[in-house]
C-alpha cells in the first residue's frame, strides 16, 4: 500500500524520488497531484456509474480495480499518475528547451490561479488556499506545488497542441 499517515510525511519521505523523465524527477511531494488528477478524471468520465465501479467510502488500496483484477484501485491510479507524469514532463521539458511560451489566455489563467484558489477556499470556509488544496490533494499539498503542477500541465498541453497544429499532412 502507498497509504501513509500525515504525520509520516516528513521532508525526507516527501523528497523521495518515485519516477523520472530525462532530467526531471517526480517525488512523493508532487505525486499526489498526478494521483488525484487520475481519480478526478476517472470520476468525471464514469460519473453516471462511478458508484458501481468504486466504493469511495473504503480506502482504494483495499479494493480491486474492475478494469484489472490484478491491481487495487490505488495501484491503478498510481500507474496512471506515473504514466501521465512522464508524458507531461517530456512535453514540458521539450517546450522549455524549444523556448515555447504559453499563450496569453493560458498565462492569464496561471497568473490568476493563486487568487482563484484562495477565493474558492474562502467561499467554502477554508482558512487558506493550502488547507483547501489539502482536502483535494492530500496533507502535503500547497499552493506553490499546485501552481507548479498546473503550469506543467498547461505548458505540456499547449505545446502538444502547437506541435499538432504545426504538422502538415
Could you tell me what each predicted segment is?
Residues 1-73:
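Short, low-structural-confidence N-terminal segments
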Residues 13-16, 87, 169:
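Short domain-boundary/entry signatures in modular proteins, especially
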Residues 40-80, 84, 96-169:
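Charged, solvent-exposed helices and adjacent loops that form client-binding or oligomerization surfaces
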Residues 88-89, 93:
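A generic alpha-helix surface/boundary motif
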Amino acid at each position: 500500500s502507498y497509504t501513509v499517515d500525515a504525520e509520516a510525511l516528513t521532508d525526507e519521505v516527501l523528497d523521495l524520488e518515485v519516477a523520472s523523465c530525462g532530467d526531471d524527477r517526480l517525488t512523493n511531494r508532487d505525486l499526489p497531484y498526478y494521483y488525484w488528477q487520475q481519480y478526478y478524471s476517472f470520476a468525471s468520465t464514469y460519473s453516471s456509474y462511478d458508484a458501481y465501479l468504486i466504493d469511495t467510502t473504503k480506502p482504494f488500496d483495499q479494493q480491486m480495480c474492475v478494469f484489472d483484477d490484478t491491481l487495487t484501485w490505488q495501484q491503478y491510479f498510481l500507474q496512471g499518475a506515473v504514466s501521465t507524469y512522464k508524458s507531461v514532463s517530456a512535453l514540458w521539458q521539450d517546450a522549455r528547451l524549444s523556448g515555447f511560451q504559453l499563450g496569453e489566455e493560458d498565462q492569464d489563467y496561471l497568473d490568476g490561479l493563486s487568487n482563484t484558489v484562495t477565493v474558492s477556499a474562502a467561499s467554502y470556509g477554508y482558512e487558506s488556499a493550502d488547507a483547501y488544496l489539502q482536502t483535494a490533494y492530500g496533507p502535503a499539498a500547497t499552493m506553490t506545488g499546485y501552481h507548479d503542477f498546473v503550469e506543467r500541465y498547461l505548458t505540456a498541453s499547449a505545446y502538444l497542441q502547437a506541435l499538432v497544429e504545426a504538422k502538415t499532412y
